[in-house]
Amino acid sequence: MTLTFRNDKPDDFLTILREVGQWLMDTNQEMWQLDTLTSDNLFDEYTCENCYVMYADQTPSATFILQWKDPLYYADVPDNTAGFIHKVAIRRQFSGQNLFAHILDFCRSECLTRSIHEIQLETDATRSALLRFYERHGFEPTYQKQIQEFGQSFLCQYCALRF
């Protein structure tokens, strides 16, 4: 399987994110409110050109945001000292194929080109299975913080991967 990453396909990005968001809702695992997954909400000065689509043999398969400044979730982290991952979504037809490991390899490589040696992410602190998934990929829990976004309140578990 040939994997490529593109940061110039916003329509593919939104399509995958909404598709995965709908599946999460249908299986009672809602992560995001579907009506918040819009270009107006997701594409801004911090995410522009940082919203990636992973293609598996030219088929759109996953999304993620890799940004270098994040005033909402990481206001206390100096710009360009960590890569911040958001909105990871892997299409169901690609589940179980270890695509997240490839996403992390790509993110590590992008970080290293900037002399950055840390990736941070945050997720819903109540999702123990998801937290274990991130820990299996090397992320260590760091702290929890309440966040407000798109009219919702979340208790976020922050995690870091250092390399």
PLM feature spans:
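Short alpha-helical
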Residues: D11-D12, P60-S61, S128-A129
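C-terminal "cap" of GNAT-fold acetyltransferases
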Residues: A82, H117-Q120, D124-S128, E135-H137, ...
